[in-house]
Amino acid sequence: MNNVLQFGLQSSAIYVAKFLVVPLRSLRVGSSFVGVGVGTRSFNKRLMSNATAFSINNSKRKELKIPGAAIDQNCHQMGSDTDRDEMGTLQDDRKEIEAMTVQELRSTLRKLGVPVKGRKQELISTLRLHMDSNLPDQKETSSSTRSDSVTIKRKISNREEPTEDECTNSEAYDIEHGEKRVKQSTEKNLKAKVSAKAIAKEQKSLMRTGKQQIQSKEETSSTISSELLKTEEIISSPSQSEPWTVLAHKKPQKDWKAYNPKTMRPPPLPEGTKCVKVMTWNVNGLRGLLKFESFSALQLAQRENFDILCLQETKLQVKDVEEIKKTLIDGYDHSFWSCSVSKLGYSGTAIISRIKPLSVRYGTGLSGHDTEGRIVTAEFDSFYLINTYVPNSGDGLKRLSYRIEEWDRTLSNHIKELEKSKPVVLTGDLNCAHEEIDIFNPAGNKRSAGFTIEERQSFGANLLDKGFVDTFRKQHPGVVGYTYWGYRHGGRKTNKGWRLDYFLVSQSIAANVHDSYILPDINGSDHCPIGLILKL
């Protein structure tokens, strides 16, 4: 054996020491191959084609066919007892495997029918496991004299061989059935029950390599399944083009569903119905939006046909307003701009309308609250429209006390004063996700600006408890719909967002709201526009 290794079509016996995996760079690629190792490392590895016929003496060889490992019946042959010592020497030499690249390891494992997921060290461990599991131990050696060959086969219920993923998910060696069918090859047909626990224990011990202990396929599959069951986060199959249709929430209730404007908006009002259509949008810098290649103000106006557009965070200076007015779309001839004078290029609000308002007011009329350009109020025939950009509590919640103790109360008083004469529509970026349904990760943002318990309680006390109705939540009580996705973590692609933008209306006109909706497909800002159709 050490001197000569012959391959041919004769009926003479061939003792194949072991199916030895070698680096792909030292092999010629063929449809299938058998690597043969002998005692001396200088002996060349040879490739054999599937077309070559092997005649092997059944009385002097053993086949061990492992489910999930055999690709071709002509491959993966075990050697005779006399070759096992030589094979042990080769198995101890791991340098060739260590030198293989990830691509070579994966290619080799695929040829063996072994799953190839994982990093390089995991692939090396898997390959070693396959080699080790094919070496008969002392008990197998002593028992080999009593039986010519033993074949362990997977139970197959009248179907083809499963794919690699199926093998992993259904516990590759079918241990869950509690026994394995053992069939004697060629001469004798013996059935022996193999203890599933013993096999699992043996596999686990074989997989210990150095400081790492690789769990068996059965244990890995079980662990993955249990972890998937434990996770509280639900993100359904995402749509690349419409990620907002994905229910994305860390702790969703069983009756919640994702907002889909294509299926959740009511039919249009009958022609001739008197109504007004208002849109609002935090543009996060108007100049930047107008330069955004995929944005067209004209196309947006044509598509939505809104009557009034409210903008927040325009970040314009007073000197920029006249230039911007020249770029407005024809028909929207009435625009009103409030800019920050205390901090340039900051905050700012605007109302752009094709309906001429009866009057316009900037700010709240109280000193100390009107220097950042956060409020524009327009009076129309049947309602007041307030466009506001509520102050963010900031990093470290530095402005939290100012917001809840001063700003929120001032805004509430301003609204209630106007409501004495007409119903009020309050819109804009209110910088508060009021309930857990309004934010992807409520538990992780309890001390984040916009979701603190103080801000949420103030939102309720100063607005909702004063008789104002959250129109979107009234129309969609169990729907997860976001209007803001941070740039930092790419939340828009996975629909991990917040609902910060609102239309709140006086209780007296809440029944006149035909539709309160979100337009998540509109890009150009970290917020998206929202709309309101109000019957007059």
Curated annotation (Swiss-Prot):
Residues 141-150 have a biased composition (Polar residues). The record marks 501 as: Important for catalytic activity. Keywords: Chloroplast, DNA damage, DNA repair, Hydrolase, Magnesium, Metal-binding, Plastid. Expressed in the siliques, flowers, and stems. A high level expression is seen in the leaves. Expressed in both vegetative and reproductive organs. Residues 129-168, 203-225 are annotated as: Disordered. Probably binds two magnesium or manganese ions per subunit. Residues 97-131 form the SAP domain. It is found in: Plastid, Chloroplast stroma, Chloroplast nucleoid. The record marks 527 as: Interaction with DNA substrate. Its EC number is 3.1.11.2. Coiled coil: none annotated. GO terms for molecular function: 3'-5' exonuclease activity; DNA binding; DNA-(apurinic or apyrimidinic site) endonuclease activity; endonuclease activity; metal ion binding; phosphatase activity; phosphodiesterase I activity. It catalyses: Exonucleolytic cleavage in the 3'- to 5'-direction to yield nucleoside 5'-phosphates. The active site is at residues 389, 527. It is an enzyme of class 3 (hydrolase). Residues 1-278 are annotated as: Highly charged. InterPro entries: AP_endonuc_1, AP_endonuclease_F1_BS, AP_endonuclease_F1_CS, Endo/exonu/phosph_ase_sf, Endo/exonuclease/phosphatase, SAP_dom, SAP_dom_sf. Belongs to the DNA repair enzymes AP/ExoA family. NCBIfam families: exoDNase_III (TIGR00195), xth (TIGR00633). This is DNA-(apurinic or apyrimidinic site) endonuclease, chloroplastic. The gene is ARP.
